[in-house]
Amino acid sequence: MNAVTIVIASMCILAIAYRLYGTFMMVKVLKVNDDKPTPAHALEDGKDYVPTNKWVSFGHHFAAIAAAGPLVGPILAAQFGYLPGLLWLLIGAVIGGAVHDIVVLFASMRKNGKSLSEVAKDELGPVAGFCTGLSMLFIITITMAGLSMVVLHALERNPWGTFAVGITIPIAMGVGLFYKKTGNLKLASTVGFLFLMAGVFIGPWVQTTALGDFLTLDTKTLAIALPVYAFFAAALPVWLLLAPRDYLSSFMKIGVFIALIVGVFVVNPSIPFPAFTEFVKGGGPVLAGPVWPFISITIACGAISGFHAFVGSGTTPKMLNKWSDMKPVAFGAMLVECLVGIMALIAATALQPADYFAINSTPEVFRTLGMNVVHLPELSGEIGLDLEGRTGGAVTLAVGMTYIFTGMPFFSHLASYFFQFVIMFEAVFILTAIDAGTRVARYLIQDFFGEVYKPLKKTDWIPGSVFASALACLMWGYLLYSGDIGSIWALFGVSNQLMASVGLIIGATIVLKIADKRRYILTCLIPLAYLYVTVNYAGYWMVRNVYLNPEAAGYSVLNGVLSIIMLVLGFIIIVAAVKKWAQMWKDPSLRMEASIPG
């Protein structure tokens, strides 16, 4: 198998899915039209509710949802071979992820941009709403801490990356102010993009100066700086920092992966990985479990991810200029993210299997595999860094992309530059999700505490916004600084996909209520059935074999208890949903004819 074949086939499948299935969801299932104003127009306040250009909204939404998942998940899942990850990315994104994202965004916009917990409360009752809100707040907290940990390791004692990431903040604020004043999006984007690229390319020079010494930060310092930054990102108006920064960052994200696609076509690397490895039944050095259910837990973003529900019921529904913008912003962004995941998978499987496992295993474990490294010593020398035992996926992606880029004409001597650039690129990729995620956590906190003190529910009340933003940053910032998260990614994988199940539950309820044909509910029920069974089995497997197994390396009673709580919350929500569906099925008066409520 070669990489070009995979890329061409994948792009064709995703394009057809967008054109046909995306249109079907918009026209037949959701019956979307532009006759009624969106929440951004109806509730415009110049701060949170702001009608925004379609492509700016796309850039913000894509930047927010495309965090570590489509990068790290496929890298780790390569342990099973290239085929399981490829199939799950394509099938999961088209049938599950794109549907999930568009129905969640639609459900939130119908309720004037309310969070998913508020929508669940309105549609399924107060108990389901409370369980949804509790699940969302729990997941967003560990997600922000987990994503930030990846950034910490990417920027630790890396002044080039720290400068390149940090400079995007004042550039974004300048773009936001300029666009707000002139309305000239093309000029603002062009100038901002040029400054962004300048910041990236002068990074190597900066690291040799006094400023570089100042930006050579350890993890503790970064663990304080990141929540402080996120506080301002969550408290400031969307148009000033969040939207323009994510919009500009999306240029870099899409640009890098277009370059990677070009590199794949030029180099046309073969895929030395087999379709299936010997670890599909479990016992692998990267992931302990079998290919099912762990392929669907390890690869979340890129296929289907509950984290997207935070953005789809948080910032994005308050930005869309027209209802029809949902197709490119939600459905389209999910399919683009799927392609990102496929490119990450190619970058990993373009390496020799022995080199891949040497990077993603500890030296002690790798010695037990009976493999011999092939190109890794040469790559380590060119990059100037010992690559063995650098687990977690981020370094593997950087090595894989560097391997492809340096195979292009005239680029063979730039390995160290490409490696550092990709590490920085990954940090920017993740920081944009932290921006939006912290703001969504702010909305959730305001919803919760607003039940006790009503003014807190007002998103335009400055003291309430400051309080909620500070509390959100304090919660995940404490976890980040203390480092007491343990096996965060396995716990996140289960809880994240459980939240995706909740999003599909809400979507199925809305579809049953408004669709002309009740069978359209299958667009949500089919992916929901698979995901709910998968996530519950994965949670059971982890609790039984890892979290509550004293002999397992990841033994953690706390993680076991938290996993059980999450599964119980999911069960309560789906029971409430089934009761609601049964009522609507029997009583047609509970269903509505209008596609968009008044």
Swiss-Prot record:
Involved in peptide utilization. The keyword Cell inner membrane does not apply. Keywords: Cell membrane, Membrane, Peptide transport, Protein transport, Transmembrane, Transmembrane helix, Transport. One of its GO terms (biological process) is peptide transport. The gene is cstA. It comes from Bacillus subtilis (strain 168). GO terms for cellular component: plasma membrane. It is a multi-pass membrane protein. PANTHER family: INNER MEMBRANE PEPTIDE TRANSPORTER (PTHR30252), PYRUVATE_PROTON SYMPORTER BTST (PTHR30252:SF3). It is found in: Cell membrane. The chain crosses the membrane at residues 6-26, 62-82, 86-106, 132-152, 159-179, 191-211, 222-242, 254-274, 291-311, 328-348, 391-411, 414-434, 461-481, 488-508, 521-541, 557-577. It comes from the Bacteria. This is Peptide transporter CstA. Belongs to the peptide transporter carbon starvation (CstA) (TC 2.A.114) family. Pfam families: CstA.
